[in-house]
Amino acid sequence: MLGLSLLLSWGLALTQTPLFGDFMLRVKPAAHDPYDTKFYRKFDRLLAGLLRWRWGVVAGVVALFALSLAVMGLMPQNFFPSLDKPYFRADVLLPEGYNIRDTERNLRLMEEWLHEQPEVKTVSVTMGSTPPRYYLASSSISLRPNFGNILIELHDRKQTEEVENRFNAYVVANCPDVWLRSSLFKLSPVPDAAIEFGFIGDDIDTLRRLTQAAEDIMWRTPGTANIRNSWGNRVPTWLPLYSQMKGQRIGVTRSQMAQGITIATQGYRLGEYREGDQFMPILLKDENIDAYNLTNLQALPIFTPAGKVYSIEQATDGFRFEYRGGVVKRYNRQRVMKAQCDPARGVNTMELFAALRDSVTRAVPLPEGYSMKVFGEQESQQESNSALAEYMPLTMILIFIVLLLLFRNYREPVIILLMIPLIFIGVVLGLAVTGKVFNFFSLLGLLGLVGMNIKNAVVLVEQIGVLRAEGKGPYDALVSATRSRIVPVAMASGTTILGMLPLLFDSMFGAMAATIMGGLLVATLLTVCVLPVVYAIFYNIRES
């Protein structure tokens, strides 16, 4: 969109500007030199001093650039900002092994409390899974009987955090079995946890040991919240030991035995029934499903394709009772167990992640055959940054080629590209003054600043070349071109800065606006002052 807009504006500038200029602008003989003013005389003295102390100017700019990079590393960073909406959502998770009735009971308590709050406008509760996608960046969770989701709308956005904190305190006091994760709406899909360290390997006990060690570090680290793992707790499991010999004798396979257990415990899914836009599962259940317990499970009926019925005891060598993981997750077909946590309210995610990564890497040794991978928001950020950086070298090469075709030598393109680092000085200043954090939109604004600063530099360098071609001396052409381009460059940058002003107070695009405004303001000032110095160094221009 930006590329198309710039292309169209370029075409209009070449056609409409001369047309309207011919109608509306009239050349008047100048009564005096327009540059013979106090401002321009002071600027000439400033520029002469900068050219006289050129190497000191270069050293100062390099020092400012290094300082800005150092400060940038200390500034708070966030991948995607929260949306400025009067909503928050809460994911409710009970321990593995709890059924849908336990989930319903706890959700009803929370719903009743929320309806009693005067700040709450509406409450939407979904049980067993996440609701249909109600906005693009919402994340989905598959069917789980111990999961619920609550969407809360308030009358005023300013009340969101206060009600959210009260709601969290109520759940802790009245629903001790519930794990609750509440969050504001974000522009990007919210992962299972903001910070995740995944341990990959084969042995389940080893994975649990490594994950538990990482969880212990999270508990000891200030600023963490919602600490858990991706597999949840172990659940008591009743295991029938299938006998291949007995099963073959009566015609019962392992899958048929598993199907029989499903029919007698939770129901076997045969298909779906559709009514309007609603889909309801069709389940085959044993009519005695509520009568089975540990004392009579060995009498579960198993049906064969031949229509015969056998008890599960006739196809097994006995039964075993043990604790097993209710959930086993995989990554690239390998078992992965994640230690997960979120930052507490007001704690920067990137800073907390850096502290945890160093501690986990140092304190959790990995056995042979096991590895650790970072997931969560950090993984999403790395993927997005990699996608942006993938074609950056090609982009810079194409920019250099275009500048090379425009000026037909190497020195002018190099001088122009050397102005790009100046934008970092302004970006840091803009974010620091406005109190914004560096996020994904700031990165997009930073990329846009590259083109804006190159445009300003091209205008100045081209004017120097025009004056030199007209026969002016190198030093006079340098000073005159810089003097004459101050107003055009300042007007172009100033209108862009003012155009960003309405976005500065937006929760989503505020950081991008601060990046562009600060970067363009400082880069424009430094370009007008520093580019002539660099040009003079490259062409060895001195005052005659």
Segments from the language model and where they lie:
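Transmembrane helices with small-residue packing motifs
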Residues: 62-98, 134, 179, 184, ...
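Transmembrane alpha-helices and their membrane-interface boundaries in multi-pass membrane transporters
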Residues: 1-31, 150, 422, 456, ...
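Solvent-exposed, membrane-proximal periplasmic/extracellular interface segments of envelope transport
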Residues: 101-190, 216, 245-265
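Signature of alpha-helical transmembrane segments and their immediate interfacial
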Residues: 32-81, 107, 121
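Alpha-helical membrane-interface segments at transmembrane helix boundaries
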Residues: 1-3, 39-54, 76, 80, ...
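Short, hydrophobic beta-strand segments
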Residues: 86-96, 137-156, 189-209, 236-248, ...
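Hydrophobic transmembrane alpha-helices and their membrane-interface caps
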Residues: 4, 398-485, 490-509, 518-522, ...
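Extracytoplasmic/periplasmic membrane-proximal domains and adjacent transmembrane bundles
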Residues: 208, 215-395, 399, 404-407, ...
